[in-house]
């Protein structure tokens, strides 16, 4: 039985990935810096699942975690808001650099069969449509400078392994803006989670900027599906994971506002960010990847999840 290590197993993507891998009959070792109570549920009591606490900034711990596995899905990351990323970038940069470097090197030394690295849309320069092969011809957006570069370095490390050791046993996935029902609804929440929280609790639904920027969103469940696909198909070229369809921030706000019966207030004193950011999905399409969770359904799932948390 193939043994898969999933880092970030308590996170938004990791939880879906754990469930999918178990459903497919893999042995799953989940690791995260925090334990999620969901793993106390009876369905995780079987012999095919093991959760282990793991701080990936500790290289020795990474070596221990990969010791008996065949495959690694490196999904762990550092969550946070664009504001914090801009004002306190080293809260992200150094921890991400350490955990990506440690886990990739540990996996190489252990001789794992396959390694999937979760990169980000932030590696791309400002453009209306992002194509995978454009990354190394350009620089990340100024709005994603630190997060973009640290994720690029993770990609570069795997390229380094290929050049130095002849290793080509890895996949790189670059998700668009991820959202889902296991998101963080605190101060560091992402766009959709933040809007749902405001819609539920505030008199007005306040939106940063004028709401015109166009973004590409993908549900965490579809990201998990893409990660699993990249491993099972042994995809060795970077692939985008997104919808390929743009949606304005104001359209997302409208879905949330309609659900809660709230008016929308646009705070034009706040920055819009890049005007348009879409994934080119041609390559992913060629491998048969198509997102299954449409945006409106996904947002309603987030709303239902958040409302459940408030009970």
Question: Could you tell me what each predicted segment is?
Answer:
Residues 56-95:
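NAD(P)H-binding glycine-rich loop region in Rossmannoid oxidoreductase-like domains
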Residues 4-24:
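N-terminal Rossmann NAD(P)H-binding glycine-rich loop of SDR-like oxidoreductase domains
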Residues 72, 86-115:
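NAD(P)-cofactor binding segment of oxidoreductase domains
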Residues 142-171, 199-201:
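Active-site Tyr-X1-5-Lys
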Residues 200-311:
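C-terminal substrate-binding subdomain of Rossmann-fold SDR/epimerase-dehydratase oxidoreductases
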Residues 84, 137-144, 170-184, 194-218, ...:
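A conserved pocket-lining segment of Rossmann-fold NAD(P)-dependent short-chain dehydrogenase/reductase
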Residues 101-144, 171:
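Conserved Rossmann-fold NAD(P)-dependent oxidoreductase catalytic core, especially the SDR/UDP-sugar
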Residues 82, 117-131, 146-152, 164, ...:
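Conserved catalytic-site region of short-chain dehydrogenase/reductase
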């Amino acid at each position: 039985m193939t043994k898969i290590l999933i880092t970030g197993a308590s996170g938004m993507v990791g939880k879906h990935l754990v469930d999918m891998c178990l459903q497919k009959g893999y042995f799953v070792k989940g690791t995260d810096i925090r334990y999620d109570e969901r793993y106390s549920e009876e369905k995780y009591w079987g012999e095919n699942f093991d959760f282990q606490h793991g701080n990936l900034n500790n290289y020795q711990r990474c070596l221990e975690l990969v010791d008996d596995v065949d495959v690694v899905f490196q999904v762990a990351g550092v969550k946070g808001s664009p504001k914090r990323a801009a004002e306190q970038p080293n809260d992200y940069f150094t921890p991400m650099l350490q955990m990506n470097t440690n886990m990739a090197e540990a996996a190489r030394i252990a001789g794992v069969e396959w390694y999937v690295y979760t990169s980000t849309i932030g590696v791309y320069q400002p453009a209306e449509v992002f194509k995978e092969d454009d990354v190394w011809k350009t620089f990340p957006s100024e709005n994603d400078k630190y997060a973009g570069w640290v994720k690029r370095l993770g990609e570069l490390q795997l390229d380094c392994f290929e050049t130095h050791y002849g290793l080509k046993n890895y996949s790189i996935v670059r998700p668009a803006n991820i959202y889902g029902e296991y998101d963080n609804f605190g101060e560091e929440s992402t766009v959709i989670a933040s809007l749902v929280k405001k819609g539920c609790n505030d008199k007005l639904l306040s939106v940063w900027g004028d709401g015109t920027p166009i973004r590409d969103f993908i549900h965490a469940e579809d990201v998990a599906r893409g990660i699993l696909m990249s491993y099972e198909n042994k995809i060795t070229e970077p692939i985008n994971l997104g919808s390929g369809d743009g949606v304005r921030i104001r359209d997302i706000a409208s879905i949330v506002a309609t659900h809660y019966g709230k008016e929308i207030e646009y705070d034009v004193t706040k920055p819009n960010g890049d005007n348009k950011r879409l994934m080119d999905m041609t390559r992913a399409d060629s491998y048969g990847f198509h997102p299954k969770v449409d945006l409106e359904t996904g947002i309603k799932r987030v709303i239902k999840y958040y409302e459940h948390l408030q009970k």
